[in-house]
């Protein structure tokens, strides 16, 4: 297995920048890291679909804070529309509706379905489990508003990438284990290179923890900002691989990257789900790294991944 040549050249440039003294994310303050992440997003932007209806929405969390949502709708598709509720990646510390705008546009167009992107609050200002509670509140809003917006509350997927995939799968588990906390039960979960186990270092973190976009030191920096204390690492809502009972959770579409420090824990989660009778469709993008969905400008073949994953989502949501 070898890196995609376009991605290898991109990683070489990133390494040159660090060698020249540009600080790594874990050497920044959270506010500096967020600004850098958004700047990088602008540099990585690709021509994602624009022929969509996009609405900015604001609702309130249970504690009265503003919760930003963004609703994407494909044109020319009859209502009621199935919905992908999407949680962006960024280690619970960085990322935003804007940083993953292109990701949501691709899934909206290529599935096609409505996409509700959730601007959950970030750590360390809002530590675990605030992001999950914001996710619960977003789902409560969707349950109340779906019919009036022409959305089908019976055909909903929970999805996300990296830390966002963690939120998506934990909410999918809660829908079965703690149904009183989740207003809508998903038909399927879309988990793109998820964080599933902060409690230990898996082998892929040793193999790919330096020089492959996501660094081990950055991972630990994320966890330390998100957790209230070390005991949170053992909470299944922080590390869903540690969940005792996964029986009955929604079928999963799982996307992994071959050069990702999170590869092994992602595969371990696939194995756990299958071992407890959950249907799982998995794709490993062999020559790619973590955050591959935002690399369409670097590796054009990433857009084909969206088509394959969108097709799987369409089947699961009974589209077409």
Give the ranges of each region predicted by the language model.
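A glycine/proline-hinged amphipathic helix-loop "lid/cap" segment
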Residues: 1-71, 318-320
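Short beta-strand-to-loop junctions in surface cap/lid or active-site-entrance loops
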Residues: 69-80, 241-246
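Short beta-strand element of the alpha/beta-hydrolase
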Residues: 80-89
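Short amphipathic alpha-helix adjacent to the substrate-entry channel of hydrolases
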Residues: 98-117
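Alpha/beta-hydrolase active-site loop
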Residues: 126-148, 309
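Gly/Ser-rich "nucleophile elbow"/oxyanion-hole loop immediately N-terminal to the catalytic nucleophile
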Residues: 143-158, 178-179
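Gly/Ala-rich beta-loop-alpha elbow adjacent to hydrolase catalytic centers
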Residues: 160, 164, 168
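Alpha/beta hydrolase fold serine-hydrolase catalytic domain that processes acyl esters and thioesters
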Residues: 169-320
């Amino acid at each position: 297995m070898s890196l995609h040549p376009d991605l290898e050249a991109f990683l070489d440039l990133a390494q040159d920048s660090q060698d020249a003294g540009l600080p790594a994310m874990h050497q920044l303050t959270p506010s500096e890291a967020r600004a850098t992440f958004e700047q990088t997003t602008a540099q990585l932007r690709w021509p994602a679909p624009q022929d969509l209806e996009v609405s900015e929405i604001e609702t309130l969390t249970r504690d009265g804070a503003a919760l930003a949502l963004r609703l994407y709708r494909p044109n020319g598709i009859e209502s009621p529309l199935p919905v992908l509720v999407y949680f962006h990646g960024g280690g619970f510390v960085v990322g935003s509706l804007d940083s993953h705008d292109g990701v949501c546009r691709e899934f909206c167009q290529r599935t096609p379905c409505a996409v509700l992107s959730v601007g959950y609050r970030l750590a360390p200002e809002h530590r675990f489990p605030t992001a999950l509670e914001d996710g619960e509140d977003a789902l409560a809003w969707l349950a109340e508003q779906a019919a009036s917006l022409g959305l089908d509350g019976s055909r909903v997927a929970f999805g996300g990438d990296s830390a966002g995939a963690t939120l998506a799968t934990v909410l999918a588990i809660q829908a079965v284990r703690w149904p009183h906390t989740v207003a809508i039960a998903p038909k399927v979960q879309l988990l793109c290179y998820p964080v599933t186990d902060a409690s230990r270092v898996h082998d892929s973190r040793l193999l790919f923890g330096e020089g492959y976009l996501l660094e081990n030191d950055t991972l630990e920096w994320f966890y330390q900002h998100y957790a209230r204390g070390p005991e949170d690492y053992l909470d299944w809502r922080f590390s869903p691989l540690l969940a005792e009972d996964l029986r009955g959770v929604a079928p999963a579409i799982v996307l992994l990257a071959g050069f990702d420090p999170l590869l092994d824990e992602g595969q371990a989660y696939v194995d756990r789900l299958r071992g407890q009778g959950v249907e799982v469709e998995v794709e490993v993008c062999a020559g790619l790294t973590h955050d591959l969905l935002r690399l369409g400008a670097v590796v054009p073949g990433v857009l084909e991944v969206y088509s394959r994953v969108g097709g799987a989502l369409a089947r699961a949501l009974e589209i077409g």
